[in-house]
Amino acid sequence: MNRLFRAVAVCLLAAVGVALAADDKPNPAATPRDSRLKQDYWKKRHESFVARAAKGDVDVLFLGDSITQGWEGAGKAVWADSFKGWKAANFGIGGDRTEDVLWRITGGKELNGIDPKLAVIMIGTNNVGSNSAEQIAGGVKAILDALHKAKPKTQVLLLGVFPRSGKPVPKDAAAATMLQPKIKQINDLISKFDDGKSVHYLDFGAKFLNDKGELPKALMPDYLHLSAAGYQIWADAIAKPVEALLKK
């Protein structure tokens, strides 16, 4: 009986040790990552941001992934028409995750030379497949903290992660938002970072959905990236909040 008791006790202690070790692991979504410097395209784009920042004169800074970068593609005309008076700069890179953006504004020094009045941040969709909602929210919080440390006077308009689908559908059909439950979890968590002072949360993802809660191809041709019409929805949704925050 004593042997059995000792064996059970050892197993329990081992299990507790494993659990504690797991809790001690750093959050990968909140750990700055510079491995994308090995990708020529990514490195060149990052370097272009550093060069742009060195010139200064940026009031509104957009930070994010390919959806943000798309302002230079499908959203180019909308950007030119909607943001012409904002002195805006687009620092979005396709494929970026929270940890990449975190490195860019810390080790990558992309903020050196600018003191934006406002940063518009939308990031996290590329983490959905490999991180928990809690980890992703932790990555977003790390970005907010790093940004505030570097630029304490910069206001932040934090956007909820946009809806998306992970399932291909027939041409011209609307797609069910398969990943929406997890995205809702993420958005529920990051919405709590709104402090009414320097961080302001805005979620307008529902504007991309039809009356069935599906993603129309006309707004998201691949059910992830926006069309020109999708970028118009984005521009319209942030126009008043941005104008208000620029006056703070």
Where are these regions (language model features)?
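Extracytoplasmic/secreted proteins, especially bacterial periplasmic and envelope-associated proteins
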Residues: 48, 62, 96, 100, ...
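Structural recognition of the beta-strand scaffold that forms the well-ordered cores
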Residues: 59-64, 87-92, 117-123, 127, ...
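Short, glycine/acidic-enriched loop or turn micro-motifs at the edges of active sites
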Residues: 68, 95, 206
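Oxyanion-hole/transition-state-stabilizing segment in secreted/luminal serine hydrolases
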Residues: 69-84, 98-141, 146, 153, ...
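Second-shell loop/turn segments in exported
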Residues: 88-93, 126-133, 176-177, 220-228
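Sec-exported extracytoplasmic/periplasmic mature domains
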Residues: 106, 124, 141, 145-152, ...
